[in-house]
Design a protein with these regions (language model features):
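Alpha-helical substrate-recognition element adjacent to the catalytic core
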Residues: 23-126, 132-199
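Extreme N-terminal starter segment of soluble prokaryotic enzymes
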Residues: 13-15
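Generic enzyme active-site microenvironment
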Residues: 17-19, 242
Length: 304
């Protein structure tokens, strides 16, 4: 199995790209239920409204059209709602501006933005800070929400790392589907997750062996990865993206390749359908058109 996009060589006329979290691996729900939401409540001291806010967090990230959204974009959405409906979020505007403007929604990018804001604040003060000298420096430079967002993200990562390996399982039917597809198409993981986490989880579940290549966040966006894979000589009609989130569909649509959805809360049935029905249509050239449109409509209805 290869590990680098530029070194990968096409071995089949067909290519099937498969997302990891929430698609092949049943790891998405537990990360949000146990890590993302609870860490947000703890970071901002929102225990008073915990039940409502955790439910809202899960709706945003798991069960509606924003499923699979970047963590910082999701945080921006819910903090706006909290600021409006529950309690003030100091420094929210600066965090919103960073989310909207940054080219990279990552911890490192946020760290750099906080440092830049601090430097700009010091320069503007000209060495003095009569109003904020005794106060909270985060408040004086407007970065309180940015700093808390970074702390939240770090704690989320720590929480995910602490999850036991037994809690990270492939969905039922994934292994059987991959086994049936192996040899008929090149199989590539296309995920926005961490490379080592994907490699470890897929290996533990005995499904890494079916894959020809693993592409993750360090290789670029899903759309970019598919775009680069197409340069290996695949026909658009012979490329299928299998995913569970609107971002997966968008990546397929941007490259004009086929899309098959793994429906949230119906994952086992979806993988069975891929193995028993959709794959044959894909390989026979009858997937596109009415059949694919019906799958996409079911996908959209399931996230409403």
């Amino acid at each position: 199995m290869g590990s680098r996009l530029e070194e990968f060589k096409r071995g089949s006329d067909y290519l099937i790209c498969i997302d990891s979290d929430g698609c092949a691996m049943d790891t998405m729900d537990i990360k949000h239920y146990r890590c993302f939401g609870p860490c947000m409540v703890a970071e901002w001291g929102l225990e008073k409204w915990q039940d409502a806010l955790l439910a809202r967090w899960n709706d945003i990230n798991l069960y509606t059209g924003t499923r699979g959204i970047n963590r910082y974009k999701a945080l921006g959405i819910i903090l706006q709602e909290i600021d409006r409906d529950y309690c003030p979020i100091p420094g929210l505007r600066a965090l919103e501006n960073w989310i909207a403007a940054t080219g990279e929604l990552s911890n490192k990018s946020l760290e750099d933005a906080i440092a830049a804001a601090k430097a700009a604040g010091s320069s503007a003060e000209g060495g003095g800070n009569p109003e904020g000298a005794a106060g909270n420096p985060a408040e004086s430079d407007g970065t309180e929400a940015m700093k808390k967002a970074l702390s939240w993200s770090v704690h989320v990562n720590e929480g995910i790392t602490a999850l036991s390996e037994d809690e990270k399982k492939a969905f039922p039917g994934v292994k059987e589907a991959l086994a049936s597809l192996k040899g008929r198409a090149d199989l590539v993981v296309v995920s926005s997750a961490n490379l080592q986490a994907v490699m470890d989880e897929w290996k533990k579940e005995g499904i890494l062996e079916y894959m020809n290549l693993v592409l993750t966040q360090n290789d670029g966006s899903k759309a970019f990865c598919i775009q680069e894979l197409l340069k290996k000589g695949y026909d658009e009609n012979r490329v299928l993206m299998v995913g569970d989130a609107p971002g997966d569909y968008d990546a397929a649509a941007k490259n004009n390749v086929c899309f098959f959805p793994i429906l949230v809360r119906k994952e086992e049935q979806s993988w069975r359908k891929l193995r028993e029905e959709a794959a044959d249509r894909f390989f026979s050239g009858s997937y596109r058109g009415e059949y694919e449109e019906a799958q996409i409509e079911s996908f959209r209805d399931n996230l409403r």
